[in-house]
Swiss-Prot record:
Regions of compositional bias (Polar residues) in chain numbering: 41-55, 469-484
Stated family: Belongs to the sorting nexin family.
CC per GO annotation: cytosol; endosome membrane
Name of the protein described by the UniProt record: Sorting nexin-41
Gene: SNX41
Gene source species: Kluyveromyces lactis (strain ATCC 8585 / CBS 2359 / DSM 70799 / NBRC 1267 / NRRL Y-1140 / WM37)
Listed InterPro entries: AH/BAR_dom_sf, PX_dom, PX_dom_sf, PX_Snx41/Atg20, Sorting_Nexin_Autophagy
Residue ranges the record marks as coiled coil: none
Domain notes: The PX domain binds phosphatidylinositol 3-phosphate which is necessary for peripheral membrane localization to the perivacuolar punctate structures.
Length: 575
């Protein structure tokens, strides 16, 4: 099963395909604080878990919207883009023009969102994407599968976040409807539009064929997920080139697969005085500090927005009382008091209007805080999670490098010990031979040792011959591993020669692996360094936009409130 198959897995309903009451719909999200705007991917504990995460279990059935019968007049009948357009040249021209607009923050726009019927006859909420004069409609599940695909295709790139699926508990409430829950859909539409534009700002994503196919109305997304390059992705990106995981070399399959237990600590790596290690360690510590700042900030912003909403609700009720009280002058029929009561009524009415303006301004300000500061801080938190995922991948590639480097050093040391043992044996033999010529006693001892050694070798060969027919290849490898742990001077000359030949062959393969992993790690360092630098620039630009919008919204709020109270004061002064 394709883990990104989205047409059978309608976007959001875990009860689809069952007899549950809400099997055909999803639940509305409340207007209050929401912790589920962005998905936070878990950082895998080992490469084995990383491999398993790519082969996830079959997702639960979900539905974008109730599959109810809707009149064609009221339904937004968006046909799948491949049925509307059949013009690859037009798309290529538009996308080429789009690439030249990299500085435009809103190159790609989601111009509308609503119910549509796909080519399979299913109703779902679709998001109409417009760019360069071409329109394509995609569902939320297709956005989600696009992001998952990009994470696997570009493991060294920080992929922008998208809004998460709604939690299951919220499906127990009112089903989400394209016409009734406009605010919720607009929020997701805004976040998905931001996701596409953030992707477009990243050169590696912008130029990737999968992202271009997502924006091309001629491609069915289900077919894209079942064809290369997505369909030929390896189960474990650690055993593939980091910049092009769909084209692994045979040597990549020989690389070790590290786990968390074998990972080196930052202190050990920094102790090597490697400039890149120190640099990436600084990146990691900066992200941790940044996260420690953003998490309480996001919580505080939600609290402030909640307080402003409570304040606006109080103003709404208070303004209604003042407006009702201003109408009470009709009970006075005395002509002498009529003009005075009329001015009093006007002053009360203006006061009520000022309170109403404060109420409306507070609502607008609350919405502005949610869009700029709250959503912005959540998005940056998710970017930090994604950056940590990328750094985690680098740590595993780095562990592969050090594992191979350490293994090569051990093999070289063993070969040197074996060869030195041979030289020592030769020197010892020459010394004994020289002494034997001068001393008959030494000659007798050497002759006795030679006979014992010959008898021992003959006996060993006979014993091994008895068990050779029943021995398995594993037994041979076991004996080899035992002999590799034996001190060199305890081995015979033939055993040392065999072991040296074997180790030299292993060393050839290890050197090839070392050259490969060295190249991979260099590519990972360059790509991640560039990606993290871009993230840092994005954070600076994001904070500038957030504070500029926040200052503008605060100024507009105070200005509207001030003008309304000035008008009310003029009416009160005339009483």
């Amino acid at each position: 099963m394709n883990v990104f198959d989205g047409s059978d897995e309608e976007d959001n309903n875990p009860f689809s395909g069952t007899t549950h009451l809400y099997a055909s719909g999803i639940a509305a999200v409340t207007d209050g604080p929401d912790d589920y705007d962005f998905t936070e991917p878990s950082i895998n504990g080992s490469s084995d878990e990383n491999a398993q995460s790519n082969a996830v279990a079959e997702p639960i059935e979900e539905t974008d919207e109730p599959a109810e019968e809707i009149d064609d007049d009221t339904l937004q009948t968006w046909r799948f883009a491949s049925a509307e357009l059949s013009r690859s040249s037009a798309f290529e021209t538009s996308y080429t023009n789009l690439l030249g607009q990299g500085k435009n923050p809103e190159v790609i726009r989601i111009v509308d969102a609503g119910q549509y019927r796909d080519i399979y006859g299913k109703y779902a909420i679709g998001y109409k994407i417009e760019f360069g004069g071409i329109v394509v409609t995609r569902r939320y599940s297709e956005f989600d599968s696009l992001r998952q695909s990009l994470c696997r295709l570009l493991p060294t790139i920080i992929i922008p976040p998208i809004p998460s699926k709604h939690p299951i508990i919220k499906y127990l409430f009112n089903p989400l409807h394209a016409k009734k829950d406009i605010k919720i859909i607009e929020r997701r539409q805004r976040l998905l539009s931001r996701f596409l534009n953030n992707c477009h700002k990243v050169r590696e994503i912008r130029n990737h064929i999968v992202f271009q196919k997502f924006l091309n109305p001629e491609y069915f997304w289900k077919e894209v997920l079942n064809t290369p390059p997505i369909s030929i992705l390896p189960m474990n990106n650690l055993l593939a080139p980091p910049l092009n995981p769909t084209k692994p070399s045979p040597i990549h399959l020989l690389l070790p697969t590290p786990t968390v237990l074998t990972m080196r600590k930052h202190e050990q790596l920094i102790g090597r005085n490697d400039v890149m290690e120190i640099k990436f360690a600084d990146y990691d510590s900066d992200l941790i500090r940044y996260k420690a700042i953003l998490q309480p900030l996001n919580k505080t912003v939600r609290s402030i927005r909640s307080n402003i909403q409570t304040y606006s609700a109080v103003l709404s009720e208070l303004g209604a009382y003042f407006n009702a009280f201003s109408l009470e002058n009709s009970v006075f029929q005395v002509s002498a008091l009529f003009e005075q009561m009329n001015r009093l009524s006007m002053g009360i009415e203006k006061t009520g209007q000022a309170i109403d303006v404060n109420y409306v301004s507070a609502e607008i300000f609350s919405e502005a805080i949610m869009i700029s500061l709250e959503e912005g801080s959540k998005e940056m938190l998710q970017f930090i999670h994604e950056a940590q995922r990328v750094l985690h991948f680098r740590n595993f590639k780095q562990e592969q490098f050090y594992t191979i480097e350490t293994t090569i050093k051990k093999r070289k040391d063993r070969i040197r010990e074996l060869k030195e043992a041979d030289l020592q044996a030769v020197r010892l033999g020459e010394a004994l031979k020289l002494n034997a010529e001068e001393s008959p006693t030494v000659a007798q001892v050497m002759d006795s040792m030679t006979r014992k050694s010959a008898n021992k070798n003959h006996t060993d060969k006979q014993i091994m011959g008895l068990f050779r027919s029943s021995a398995s290849p594993n037994n041979k490898s076991g004996s080899d591993s035992i002999s590799s742990e034996v001190e060199p001077h305890l081995l015979t000359k033939d055993e040392r020669v065999v072991q040296v030949n074997k180790l030299e062959k292993e060393l050839e393969k290890l050197n090839e692996c070392f050259k490969l992993i060295e190249k991979d790690l260099q590519q990972v360092n360059e790509s991640m360094d560039n990606s993290l630098n871009n993230l840092e620039k994005y954070f600076h630009e994001k904070w500038f936009l957030i504070f500029r919008e926040l200052a503008h919204n605060i100024t507009s709020w105070l200005k509207d409130c001030s003008e309304s109270w000035k008008n009310a004061k003029q009416s009160i002064d005339s009483i």
